Amino acid sequence: MSLPFYTIDDFNLEDKTVLVRVDINSPVDPSTGSILDDTKIKLHAETIDEISKKGAKTVVLAHQSRPGKKDFTTLQQHAKALSNILNRPVDYIDDIFGTAAREEIKRLKKGDILLLENVRFYPEEILKRDPHQQAETHMVRKLYPIIDIFINDAFAAAHRSQPSLVGFAVKLPSGAGRIMEKELKSLYGAVDNAEKPCVYVLGGVKVDDSIMVLENVLRNGSADYVLTTGLVANIFLWASGINLGKYNEDFIINKGYIDFVEKGKQLLEEFDGQIKMPDDVAVCVDNARVEYCTKNIPNKPIYDIGTNTITEYAKFIRDAKTIFANGPAGVFEQEGFSIGTEDILNTIASSNGYSIIGGGHLAAAANQMGLSSGITHISSGGGASINLLAGEKLPVVEILTEVKMKGRK
Protein backbone atom coordinates (compact mmCIF):
# COMPACT_ATOMS: atom_id res chain seq x y z
CA MET A 1 0.00 0.00 0.00
CA SER A 2 1.34 3.42 -1.00
CA LEU A 3 1.22 5.78 1.97
CA PRO A 4 0.67 9.54 1.65
CA PHE A 5 3.39 10.32 4.21
CA TYR A 6 7.04 9.47 4.83
CA THR A 7 8.06 6.67 7.20
CA ILE A 8 11.32 5.80 8.96
CA ASP A 9 12.41 3.99 5.78
CA ASP A 10 12.60 7.31 3.89
CA PHE A 11 15.32 8.80 6.11
CA ASN A 12 19.02 8.26 6.74
CA LEU A 13 19.13 8.48 10.54
CA GLU A 14 22.88 7.94 10.99
CA ASP A 15 24.29 10.59 13.36
CA LYS A 16 21.07 12.62 13.13
CA THR A 17 19.23 14.10 16.12
CA VAL A 18 15.74 12.61 15.85
CA LEU A 19 12.76 13.83 17.90
CA VAL A 20 10.20 11.04 18.37
CA ARG A 21 6.68 11.81 19.65
CA VAL A 22 5.15 8.72 21.22
CA ASP A 23 2.05 7.95 23.30
CA ILE A 24 3.21 6.13 26.44
CA ASN A 25 0.37 7.52 28.58
CA SER A 26 -0.03 4.68 31.10
CA PRO A 27 -2.09 3.74 34.16
CA VAL A 28 -0.17 5.02 37.20
CA ASP A 29 -0.70 4.35 40.90
CA PRO A 30 -1.26 7.89 42.25
CA SER A 31 0.06 7.00 45.71
CA THR A 32 3.37 5.46 44.60
CA GLY A 33 3.81 6.88 41.09
CA SER A 34 4.56 3.38 39.79
CA ILE A 35 3.34 2.28 36.36
CA LEU A 36 0.58 -0.33 36.60
CA ASP A 37 0.55 -1.39 32.93
CA ASP A 38 3.49 -0.88 30.55
CA THR A 39 1.70 -2.08 27.39
CA LYS A 40 1.99 1.26 25.58
CA ILE A 41 5.66 1.63 26.52
CA LYS A 42 6.39 -1.83 25.08
CA LEU A 43 4.46 -0.89 21.95
CA HIS A 44 6.53 2.22 21.21
CA ALA A 45 9.83 0.67 22.29
CA GLU A 46 10.05 -0.90 18.81
CA THR A 47 10.18 2.48 17.05
CA ILE A 48 12.54 4.03 19.61
CA ASP A 49 14.88 1.02 19.47
CA GLU A 50 14.98 0.98 15.67
CA ILE A 51 15.76 4.69 15.41
CA SER A 52 18.50 4.44 18.03
CA LYS A 53 20.07 1.35 16.45
CA LYS A 54 20.20 3.15 13.11
CA GLY A 55 22.72 5.51 14.69
CA ALA A 56 20.43 8.38 15.67
CA LYS A 57 20.62 10.54 18.76
CA THR A 58 17.07 9.85 19.92
CA VAL A 59 15.02 12.43 21.82
CA VAL A 60 11.63 11.17 23.03
CA LEU A 61 8.65 13.45 23.62
CA ALA A 62 5.53 12.15 25.40
CA HIS A 63 2.66 13.02 27.74
CA GLN A 64 1.15 11.45 30.84
CA SER A 65 -2.49 12.17 31.72
CA ARG A 66 -3.61 15.82 31.94
CA PRO A 67 -3.59 18.66 34.51
CA GLY A 68 -5.89 18.08 37.48
CA LYS A 69 -5.82 14.28 37.36
CA LYS A 70 -4.17 12.16 40.05
CA ASP A 71 -1.97 10.33 37.54
CA PHE A 72 -0.59 13.59 36.07
CA THR A 73 3.05 12.85 36.88
CA THR A 74 6.61 13.19 35.61
CA LEU A 75 8.01 10.70 33.11
CA GLN A 76 10.82 9.48 35.37
CA GLN A 77 9.17 6.07 35.90
CA HIS A 78 8.45 5.82 32.17
CA ALA A 79 12.17 6.26 31.44
CA LYS A 80 13.01 3.44 33.87
CA ALA A 81 10.35 1.20 32.33
CA LEU A 82 11.58 1.93 28.79
CA SER A 83 15.16 1.23 29.87
CA ASN A 84 14.11 -2.16 31.30
CA ILE A 85 12.20 -3.06 28.13
CA LEU A 86 15.07 -2.07 25.82
CA ASN A 87 17.70 -3.48 28.19
CA ARG A 88 19.82 -0.37 27.68
CA PRO A 89 20.16 3.08 29.29
CA VAL A 90 17.43 5.67 28.72
CA ASP A 91 18.26 9.08 30.15
CA TYR A 92 15.55 11.32 31.59
CA ILE A 93 15.53 15.06 32.23
CA ASP A 94 12.87 17.01 34.11
CA ASP A 95 12.78 19.72 31.45
CA ILE A 96 11.06 20.03 28.07
CA PHE A 97 12.66 22.85 26.09
CA GLY A 98 14.59 24.95 28.62
CA THR A 99 18.36 25.44 28.67
CA ALA A 100 18.93 22.18 30.59
CA ALA A 101 16.97 20.10 28.04
CA ARG A 102 18.62 21.76 25.05
CA GLU A 103 22.14 21.29 26.46
CA GLU A 104 21.39 17.64 27.21
CA ILE A 105 20.18 17.12 23.62
CA LYS A 106 23.37 18.70 22.25
CA ARG A 107 25.48 16.31 24.37
CA LEU A 108 23.85 13.17 22.96
CA LYS A 109 26.00 10.66 21.06
CA LYS A 110 24.98 8.15 18.39
CA GLY A 111 22.65 5.52 19.85
CA ASP A 112 21.79 7.54 22.96
CA ILE A 113 18.15 7.87 24.08
CA LEU A 114 16.81 10.83 26.08
CA LEU A 115 13.24 11.12 27.40
CA LEU A 116 12.12 14.71 28.00
CA GLU A 117 9.62 15.73 30.70
CA ASN A 118 5.84 15.28 30.41
CA VAL A 119 4.96 17.63 27.57
CA ARG A 120 1.62 18.53 29.20
CA PHE A 121 3.48 20.28 32.03
CA TYR A 122 3.79 23.02 29.39
CA PRO A 123 0.51 25.07 29.23
CA GLU A 124 0.55 25.73 25.46
CA GLU A 125 0.42 21.97 24.80
CA ILE A 126 -3.26 21.92 25.79
CA LEU A 127 -4.21 24.46 23.08
CA LYS A 128 -5.89 23.07 19.97
CA ARG A 129 -4.93 25.12 16.94
CA ASP A 130 -3.84 24.90 13.33
CA PRO A 131 -0.43 23.17 12.85
CA HIS A 132 1.11 26.36 11.46
CA GLN A 133 0.06 28.25 14.60
CA GLN A 134 1.38 25.44 16.79
CA ALA A 135 4.72 25.71 14.99
CA GLU A 136 5.13 29.18 16.50
CA THR A 137 4.77 28.03 20.13
CA HIS A 138 7.76 28.43 22.45
CA MET A 139 8.43 24.68 22.64
CA VAL A 140 8.64 24.19 18.87
CA ARG A 141 10.68 27.35 18.28
CA LYS A 142 13.17 26.42 21.03
CA LEU A 143 13.65 22.77 20.07
CA TYR A 144 13.43 22.52 16.29
CA PRO A 145 16.78 24.28 15.53
CA ILE A 146 18.68 21.46 17.31
CA ILE A 147 16.62 18.63 15.75
CA ASP A 148 17.24 17.12 12.29
CA ILE A 149 14.19 14.88 11.81
CA PHE A 150 10.78 14.54 13.51
CA ILE A 151 9.10 11.13 13.73
CA ASN A 152 5.50 10.95 14.98
CA ASP A 153 4.51 7.56 16.37
CA ALA A 154 1.66 8.75 18.62
CA PHE A 155 -1.26 7.28 16.67
CA ALA A 156 -3.48 7.21 19.77
CA ALA A 157 -3.25 11.03 19.84
CA ALA A 158 -3.42 11.54 16.05
CA HIS A 159 -6.85 13.19 16.33
CA ARG A 160 -5.39 16.04 18.43
CA SER A 161 -3.87 19.21 16.97
CA GLN A 162 -1.39 20.13 19.71
CA PRO A 163 2.13 21.64 19.45
CA SER A 164 4.12 18.45 20.14
CA LEU A 165 1.95 16.49 17.69
CA VAL A 166 1.68 18.82 14.69
CA GLY A 167 3.97 21.82 15.23
CA PHE A 168 7.35 20.19 14.55
CA ALA A 169 6.19 18.75 11.22
CA VAL A 170 5.77 22.32 9.91
CA LYS A 171 9.43 23.08 10.62
CA LEU A 172 11.27 19.78 10.07
CA PRO A 173 11.58 16.79 7.72
CA SER A 174 8.96 14.50 9.25
CA GLY A 175 7.50 11.02 8.99
CA ALA A 176 5.51 8.32 10.76
CA GLY A 177 6.89 5.82 13.24
CA ARG A 178 6.17 2.10 13.03
CA ILE A 179 3.02 2.12 15.19
CA MET A 180 1.55 5.04 13.24
CA GLU A 181 2.41 3.32 9.95
CA LYS A 182 0.93 -0.04 11.00
CA GLU A 183 -2.27 1.49 12.39
CA LEU A 184 -2.97 3.59 9.31
CA LYS A 185 -2.22 0.75 6.88
CA SER A 186 -4.69 -1.48 8.73
CA LEU A 187 -7.43 1.12 9.09
CA TYR A 188 -7.13 2.56 5.57
CA GLY A 189 -7.22 -1.01 4.27
CA ALA A 190 -10.41 -1.73 6.21
CA VAL A 191 -12.10 1.45 4.95
CA ASP A 192 -10.87 1.74 1.37
CA ASN A 193 -10.41 -1.90 0.38
CA ALA A 194 -12.74 -3.80 2.69
CA GLU A 195 -13.53 -7.26 1.37
CA LYS A 196 -17.27 -7.92 1.33
CA PRO A 197 -19.33 -8.74 3.21
CA CYS A 198 -18.08 -6.20 5.76
CA VAL A 199 -19.64 -6.17 9.24
CA TYR A 200 -19.24 -3.60 12.02
CA VAL A 201 -20.05 -4.52 15.62
CA LEU A 202 -20.61 -1.30 17.58
CA GLY A 203 -21.32 -1.18 21.30
CA GLY A 204 -20.18 0.40 24.54
CA VAL A 205 -21.47 3.62 26.06
CA LYS A 206 -19.90 6.19 23.70
CA VAL A 207 -23.03 6.50 21.61
CA ASP A 208 -21.98 9.67 19.76
CA ASP A 209 -18.79 8.04 18.44
CA SER A 210 -20.54 4.84 17.38
CA ILE A 211 -23.36 6.62 15.57
CA MET A 212 -20.85 8.80 13.69
CA VAL A 213 -19.04 5.65 12.54
CA LEU A 214 -22.27 3.80 11.72
CA GLU A 215 -23.57 6.63 9.57
CA ASN A 216 -20.27 7.08 7.73
CA VAL A 217 -19.57 3.41 6.92
CA LEU A 218 -23.12 2.69 5.78
CA ARG A 219 -23.35 5.87 3.73
CA ASN A 220 -20.02 5.37 1.96
CA GLY A 221 -20.81 1.70 1.36
CA SER A 222 -17.79 0.27 3.19
CA ALA A 223 -20.06 -1.67 5.61
CA ASP A 224 -22.84 -4.06 4.66
CA TYR A 225 -24.24 -4.51 8.17
CA VAL A 226 -23.84 -2.91 11.59
CA LEU A 227 -24.59 -5.12 14.59
CA THR A 228 -25.47 -2.96 17.59
CA THR A 229 -24.77 -3.88 21.21
CA GLY A 230 -24.44 -2.07 24.54
CA LEU A 231 -26.00 1.37 24.98
CA VAL A 232 -25.84 1.86 21.20
CA ALA A 233 -28.31 -1.03 20.80
CA ASN A 234 -30.61 0.45 23.46
CA ILE A 235 -30.74 3.74 21.53
CA PHE A 236 -31.80 1.96 18.34
CA LEU A 237 -34.27 -0.30 20.14
CA TRP A 238 -35.97 2.76 21.62
CA ALA A 239 -35.86 4.47 18.23
CA SER A 240 -37.59 1.44 16.68
CA GLY A 241 -40.49 1.72 19.14
CA ILE A 242 -39.38 -0.80 21.78
CA ASN A 243 -40.29 0.06 25.39
CA LEU A 244 -37.00 -0.16 27.32
CA GLY A 245 -38.54 0.47 30.73
CA LYS A 246 -38.23 3.70 32.70
CA TYR A 247 -34.84 2.79 34.21
CA ASN A 248 -33.12 2.33 30.83
CA GLU A 249 -34.85 5.28 29.17
CA ASP A 250 -33.92 7.57 32.09
CA PHE A 251 -30.32 6.34 31.81
CA ILE A 252 -30.20 7.45 28.15
CA ILE A 253 -31.77 10.82 29.02
CA ASN A 254 -29.37 11.41 31.94
CA LYS A 255 -26.38 10.58 29.73
CA GLY A 256 -27.48 13.36 27.38
CA TYR A 257 -28.18 10.96 24.51
CA ILE A 258 -31.92 11.54 23.99
CA ASP A 259 -31.30 13.37 20.68
CA PHE A 260 -29.71 10.20 19.31
CA VAL A 261 -33.03 8.38 19.63
CA GLU A 262 -34.50 10.68 16.97
CA LYS A 263 -31.29 10.32 14.94
CA GLY A 264 -31.67 6.55 15.29
CA LYS A 265 -35.17 6.70 13.77
CA GLN A 266 -33.80 8.50 10.71
CA LEU A 267 -30.92 6.04 10.31
CA LEU A 268 -33.18 2.99 10.66
CA GLU A 269 -35.38 4.38 7.90
CA GLU A 270 -32.45 5.30 5.63
CA PHE A 271 -30.53 2.03 6.10
CA ASP A 272 -33.48 -0.34 6.39
CA GLY A 273 -32.27 -3.87 7.17
CA GLN A 274 -28.60 -2.96 7.52
CA ILE A 275 -28.71 -1.90 11.19
CA LYS A 276 -29.21 -5.00 13.33
CA MET A 277 -30.61 -4.82 16.87
CA PRO A 278 -30.88 -7.41 19.66
CA ASP A 279 -34.07 -9.47 19.81
CA ASP A 280 -33.34 -10.39 23.42
CA VAL A 281 -31.41 -8.77 26.29
CA ALA A 282 -30.03 -9.72 29.70
CA VAL A 283 -31.24 -7.56 32.58
CA CYS A 284 -30.02 -7.40 36.15
CA VAL A 285 -32.58 -8.76 38.64
CA ASP A 286 -31.31 -9.04 42.24
CA ASN A 287 -27.72 -9.07 40.91
CA ALA A 288 -28.51 -12.03 38.65
CA ARG A 289 -28.72 -12.37 34.85
CA VAL A 290 -32.25 -12.84 33.52
CA GLU A 291 -32.99 -12.78 29.78
CA TYR A 292 -36.05 -11.25 28.15
CA CYS A 293 -37.32 -10.81 24.61
CA THR A 294 -37.00 -7.14 23.63
CA LYS A 295 -40.80 -6.91 23.35
CA ASN A 296 -41.10 -7.62 27.09
CA ILE A 297 -38.25 -5.73 28.77
CA PRO A 298 -39.01 -5.14 32.48
CA ASN A 299 -38.12 -1.95 34.35
CA LYS A 300 -34.65 -3.30 35.18
CA PRO A 301 -31.18 -2.30 33.90
CA ILE A 302 -30.11 -3.90 30.62
CA TYR A 303 -26.56 -5.20 31.14
CA ASP A 304 -25.94 -7.43 28.09
CA ILE A 305 -27.34 -8.81 24.86
CA GLY A 306 -29.23 -12.12 25.09
CA THR A 307 -28.18 -15.58 23.90
CA ASN A 308 -30.51 -15.57 20.86
CA THR A 309 -28.94 -12.30 19.72
CA ILE A 310 -25.43 -13.71 20.29
CA THR A 311 -26.30 -16.69 18.06
CA GLU A 312 -27.79 -14.46 15.35
CA TYR A 313 -24.87 -12.00 15.40
CA ALA A 314 -22.37 -14.89 15.23
CA LYS A 315 -23.81 -15.87 11.82
CA PHE A 316 -23.11 -12.40 10.40
CA ILE A 317 -19.58 -12.40 11.85
CA ARG A 318 -18.73 -15.89 10.52
CA ASP A 319 -19.97 -14.96 7.03
CA ALA A 320 -18.01 -11.67 6.95
CA LYS A 321 -14.73 -11.17 5.09
CA THR A 322 -14.01 -7.96 7.05
CA ILE A 323 -15.01 -7.33 10.68
CA PHE A 324 -14.56 -4.19 12.76
CA ALA A 325 -15.60 -4.18 16.42
CA ASN A 326 -15.61 -1.40 18.99
CA GLY A 327 -17.07 -1.26 22.49
CA PRO A 328 -18.19 -4.11 24.77
CA ALA A 329 -21.62 -5.72 24.35
CA GLY A 330 -22.61 -4.99 27.94
CA VAL A 331 -21.40 -4.44 31.50
CA PHE A 332 -18.75 -7.13 31.03
CA GLU A 333 -16.98 -6.33 34.31
CA GLN A 334 -20.00 -7.59 36.28
CA GLU A 335 -20.31 -11.31 36.92
CA GLY A 336 -22.87 -12.94 34.65
CA PHE A 337 -22.92 -10.14 32.09
CA SER A 338 -19.70 -10.75 30.16
CA ILE A 339 -21.24 -13.48 27.98
CA GLY A 340 -22.14 -11.19 25.05
CA THR A 341 -18.71 -9.54 24.92
CA GLU A 342 -16.85 -12.85 25.33
CA ASP A 343 -18.89 -14.76 22.74
CA ILE A 344 -18.61 -11.99 20.15
CA LEU A 345 -14.83 -11.82 20.67
CA ASN A 346 -14.53 -15.61 20.44
CA THR A 347 -16.51 -15.62 17.19
CA ILE A 348 -14.35 -12.83 15.72
CA ALA A 349 -11.12 -14.57 16.77
CA SER A 350 -12.20 -17.89 15.24
CA SER A 351 -13.53 -16.34 12.01
CA ASN A 352 -11.65 -16.39 8.71
CA GLY A 353 -12.25 -12.67 8.09
CA TYR A 354 -9.85 -9.74 8.37
CA SER A 355 -10.62 -8.42 11.86
CA ILE A 356 -9.94 -5.13 13.64
CA ILE A 357 -10.73 -4.15 17.21
CA GLY A 358 -10.78 -0.41 17.88
CA GLY A 359 -8.88 -0.26 21.18
CA GLY A 360 -10.30 0.62 24.60
CA HIS A 361 -12.32 -1.79 26.76
CA LEU A 362 -12.93 -4.33 23.98
CA ALA A 363 -9.20 -4.57 23.24
CA ALA A 364 -8.51 -5.03 26.96
CA ALA A 365 -11.12 -7.80 27.10
CA ALA A 366 -9.58 -9.56 24.07
CA ASN A 367 -6.14 -9.44 25.69
CA GLN A 368 -7.49 -10.72 29.03
CA MET A 369 -9.17 -13.62 27.24
CA GLY A 370 -5.97 -14.49 25.36
CA LEU A 371 -7.64 -13.91 21.99
CA SER A 372 -5.33 -11.22 20.61
CA SER A 373 -3.49 -13.70 18.35
CA GLY A 374 -6.79 -14.50 16.62
CA ILE A 375 -7.50 -10.84 15.80
CA THR A 376 -5.81 -9.43 12.69
CA HIS A 377 -5.27 -5.99 14.23
CA ILE A 378 -5.97 -4.52 17.67
CA SER A 379 -5.75 -0.73 17.49
CA SER A 380 -3.72 1.17 20.09
CA GLY A 381 -5.80 4.31 19.60
CA GLY A 382 -9.52 4.16 20.30
CA GLY A 383 -10.28 7.85 19.73
CA ALA A 384 -8.06 8.18 16.66
CA SER A 385 -9.34 5.01 15.00
CA ILE A 386 -12.96 5.97 15.69
CA ASN A 387 -12.41 9.44 14.20
CA LEU A 388 -10.83 7.94 11.08
CA LEU A 389 -13.67 5.42 10.60
CA ALA A 390 -16.20 8.20 11.15
CA GLY A 391 -14.71 10.04 8.17
CA GLU A 392 -13.01 12.72 10.27
CA LYS A 393 -9.61 14.08 9.30
CA LEU A 394 -6.72 13.34 11.69
CA PRO A 395 -4.57 16.49 12.16
CA VAL A 396 -1.36 14.47 12.62
CA VAL A 397 -1.92 12.56 9.38
CA GLU A 398 -2.90 15.74 7.53
CA ILE A 399 0.35 17.54 8.42
CA LEU A 400 2.52 14.47 7.70
CA THR A 401 0.80 14.22 4.30
CA GLU A 402 1.54 17.91 3.67
CA VAL A 403 5.23 17.27 4.44
CA LYS A 404 5.42 14.56 1.76
CA MET A 405 3.43 16.59 -0.77
CA LYS A 406 6.00 19.37 -0.38
CA GLY A 407 8.86 16.87 -0.60
CA ARG A 408 10.32 18.05 2.69
CA LYS A 409 12.75 15.35 3.81
Swiss-Prot record:
InterPro entries documented for this protein: Phosphoglycerate_kinase, Phosphoglycerate_kinase_CS, Phosphoglycerate_kinase_N, Phosphoglycerate_kinase_sf
Pfam families: PGK (PF00162)
MF (Gene Ontology): ADP binding; ATP binding; phosphoglycerate kinase activity
Keywords carried by this UniProt record: ATP-binding, Cytoplasm, Glycolysis, Kinase, Nucleotide-binding, Transferase
Binding site for ATP: 333, 359-362
Gene Ontology terms: biological process: gluconeogenesis; glycolytic process
Catalytic activity annotation: (2R)-3-phosphoglycerate + ATP = (2R)-3-phospho-glyceroyl phosphate + ADP
Keyword Glycosyltransferase assigned: no
Superkingdom of the organism of origin: Archaea
Residues given in the record as substrate binding sites: 23-25, 63-66, 120, 160
EC id: 2.7.2.3
Cellular component terms per the entry's GO annotation: cytosol
HAMAP family in the cross-refs: Phosphoglyc_kinase
Complexes and interactors: Monomer.
Descriptive protein name: Phosphoglycerate kinase
Origin species: Methanobacterium bryantii
Gene: pgk
